[in-house]
Amino acid sequence: LKKNKKMIAHHVLFWLKADMTEEQKTAFRKSLDTLQFIDVVKFFHVGTPAPIERAVVDTSYTFSLLLVFEDLAAHDVYQVHPLHKAFLDEFRAFFDKVTIYDAH
């Protein structure tokens, strides 16, 4: 994936509520995985904190979602896409905290 000046990186960190069951976490992860099928997504990665122990590395989150879009217009399409909206509708109640970093 070669970067162009219009590309948008959309990095979302999720802190899930402490009382979530393993089944709920699995369902959450599976729902995140569906977001890769949104046609404007050029790059997709879901993960959990890597076992890196450095003072500057934050490993307190539960899941990381990294998406890359061709441009801001594609990002905007993603925001209103039915799969994204379904994910939010189903799982928003499980978020304890969400932090988003968007960069171009």
What is each model feature region?
Residues 66-68, 72-98:
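C-terminal structural segments of small proteins and small subunits
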Residues 41-46, 90-102:
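Conserved short beta-strand edge segments in small beta-sheet-based binding/regulatory domains
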Residues 1-62, 70-77, 104:
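Short S/T/G/P-rich N-terminal loop/turn motif that feeds into the first structured element of a domain
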